[in-house]
Every structure is written in structure tokens, then in C-alpha cells.
Amino acid sequence: MEVYIPIIYWKSCSEKEKREILFRPVVNDNSQIKEVVKEIITNVKNSGDKALYDYTKTFDKIRLESIQVSYGEIVDSDSFVNEEIQKSISVAKNNIKIFHEKQTHNVVNIEIQPGVFCRQIIRPIQSVGLYIPGGCAPLVSTVLMLAIPAKIVGCKNIILCSPPPITKEILYASKICGIHNIFQVGGAQAIAAMAFGTKTIPKVNKIFGPGNVYVTEAKLQINALLNDLSIDMLAGPSEILIIADFKANACIIASDFLSQMEHGIYSQAILVTPSYDLACNVIFEINIQLKNLSRKKVINKSLKYSRIIVTKTLLECFEISNLYAPEHLIIQCENSNRLLVYVINAGSIFLGRWSAVASGDYVTGTNHVLPTYGSAIVNSGLTVMDFQKIISVQKLDQQGLIDVSSSIISLSEVERMDAHTNSIKQRLIALQDVK
């Protein structure tokens, strides 16, 4: 059966229609999911490992002998991973490491005025938990994207959770990243275990990694419950927006369109172009390429959320993209570098004909953990800074204190903070004794 995607003329749409066109599919607006997750969190908090064994038996249909993967199994994992995959993992690891090592924050250390010194020091988050989803295929690349930045900044305790049975590829990727505390537990129960800690799984300070609606809901609830724990971001369905000019390659655009939609039934792909002919050619190519794909059933379901929009000008394409704030933005146009100036909101950008999203998903070195659901308006993709915290430091010498004291006293009196005022006056008195 041929796929039909209607071509939308942006100029002809009302403001209401435009909002509806760029609307994301609603995935987890479900009170039942919220209640199920709440119960799981409570049970794991109260019953610890027992709850994890029970949930693994119920949800994964596996009776575990041990929650923790043995060191020997991790070390021996390379015996079960073929040489080609090992080589590919090594290429990806090296590129990710190179890019993320360059993200180290500039140290601020300045004398604001004579005698007043300010600086920032950067410290790693001590304990982090990495969640790697299970499902139909091992997400080896996600292990690399999370583990490498954590190791670069020096997080002291790094643990990894993934639903059983954990594949040898995931164990191997963890091993070469130096991760040896691996636990075969998944879903909302894994998030709860890392948040509260159990006899086997240590409590962490921050949880990273994508997952299904139950994992996402668990991260949301846990983040609201605990002050000493945070999360990286709430991952929604994968999405792509492609801006293409008259000379763009329809075959390549169709392949990018389809590659995004195979992630899941709620994935969304949008093409925005001033060329009606290109739009028609892309639809034609989608039908040709779809026939040969193994996940065409998933793609056919996600097609209902996909859009092809024809604009009057190329600049209008960028206006639409900034409204949508895509996770992945492809600019398949001439002089794509020069067009970067028009991009305000995007998770990750792929410039030119040869830059497939798949390259960033795996090996270019940039991180593929990106803001979705429009959160690229205010959020960034994962960097080493997500595994660190910045602490401000200040030091005043005697003259520095004297010079700023009147301003501090004046401002603290305006705010009626007389104890603040007193803390300065006591130091001024102590200065008299020093002299």
C-alpha cells in the first residue's frame, strides 16, 4: 500500500492550524501510568532488592539469580562480540572522547576590584546512574554517550542499569569505558533503585538516560521527591526537522525521514521546503525506500505524525524550525554554514547533504542525548557539564572589605537584614584591633 503524506502550504494555514501542524503526539498523559509508577517507586523504596526481583519476574519474565552482573562476565564480554563491532565501538568511543574532552569549562579567576577576588571551581558529581533501555536492540551507543563524559570529568561512582538479559555488546561497551558496576534491572524500578538505593544498588546523585513512558514518568516523580538527586532530562519520542532548498537530494531526504520514524510509533519527521517539486519527489522516494525496510510497520504508524510543509521562502523554513525547536535539525541547502545564523532553537544540527543524523547518533563525537518535545527552546544536549557542578569562591583582603563595606551595609539595611549588616560591622571592628 502506498504511503500518502499531504503537502501543507504554510501560507494558507491559519494561526490555529499552524499550531496544530507543529503539535507533538501526546505520549504519557495517562493517570494510570502515573499511579503504576508511583506504586513501583514506593515498593522499591520500602522493599529494596526484593521488589526488584519481583518486578523483573513480572515485567521481564526472568527469574534472576543476581541483580549485579559479575565482574567475570563483564571482562569476558569481548569473547562474544565480533571484531567488526568491537572496531566500530572503538571508533565511536575515540571520537566521543575527543569532542567531549574539549568541552571543559573555562576557569574564571579574577580580581573584581582591588582586594576582592572571585573565581569558580568545578567539581564532578560524585555518584551517577546511567540507564540504558532494553527493547528490541542493544543501545550500545547510549552507553558510550553517557559513560564517556562521566569518566572524563571524574565522577567517583558510576553505575549502570539495563533490563535483563543485558547483551554482550552493552557489557563490552561498558567495559571499555571503565564501567564495572552493572545491574540487570530496568524500567521504573531501576530508576527508583538508583534514587533511593537498595542493599545491592547504591544510591546516586544524578540519573541519566532515556527510556519508555514508565522510565520517563519515574524520573519525573523522583526528581520532584528528592532534593539530593536530579535527572539529565525527560526524553520524549525522537524527532527530526529537515530544511531543504530547490537543489536538495530527495533520495537522501527520504532516507533521513524514514530513519527517524523507525525509532517508534510516536516519532515525528517534518520536511520544510520552498520547493513543491522537491516535496513531491520526497514522498515518491519514501514509498520506494519504505518497501525494503524491516521496521516498516512501525514507520507506517509514525507517518501520521509526520509533515511536509511548503513555504514561500527559505527564511520562512527557519522561522518554522525555530517555532518547532527540533531535537535533530538537518539543513540540506547550499551554503548551509552561512544559514546557521538563522537557527535559534535545535538540539543538534546536521549541515549539508552528507551529514546524516545517524552519523551523530553513533560516531561523529557529538552527544546524541538531546532535548525533545520542544524543550530545545531552553535546553541543550548532554555535555560534560551535566556531570559537573560549578562552585563560586570569593576572598576579600582587609582593604577589599573596607572598600565594599559601605555598599554592603547600605543594601542590607534596605532589605532590613540587620544581621547581615552586623556581620560587616563586626569585621570592621576587628580590623581596628589588627591595626
Swiss-Prot record:
SUPFAM superfamilies: ALDH-like (SSF53720). GO terms for cellular component: cytosol. It catalyses: L-histidinol + 2 NAD(+) + H2O = L-histidine + 2 NADH + 3 H(+). Binds 1 zinc ion per subunit. GO terms for biological process: L-histidine biosynthetic process. It is an enzyme of class 1 (oxidoreductase). Substrate binds at residues 238, 260, 263, 328, 361, 415, 420. It comes from the Bacteria. GO terms for molecular function: histidinol dehydrogenase activity; NAD binding; zinc ion binding. Its cofactor is Zn(2+). Keywords: Amino-acid biosynthesis, Histidine biosynthesis, Metal-binding, NAD, Oxidoreductase, Zinc. Pathway: Amino-acid biosynthesis; L-histidine biosynthesis; L-histidine from 5-phospho-alpha-D-ribose 1-diphosphate: step 9/9. The active site is at 327 (proton acceptor), 328 (proton acceptor). Zn(2+) binds at residues 260, 263, 361, 420. Homodimer. Belongs to the histidinol dehydrogenase family. Catalyzes the sequential NAD-dependent oxidations of L-histidinol to L-histidinaldehyde and then to L-histidine. This is Histidinol dehydrogenase. The gene is hisD.
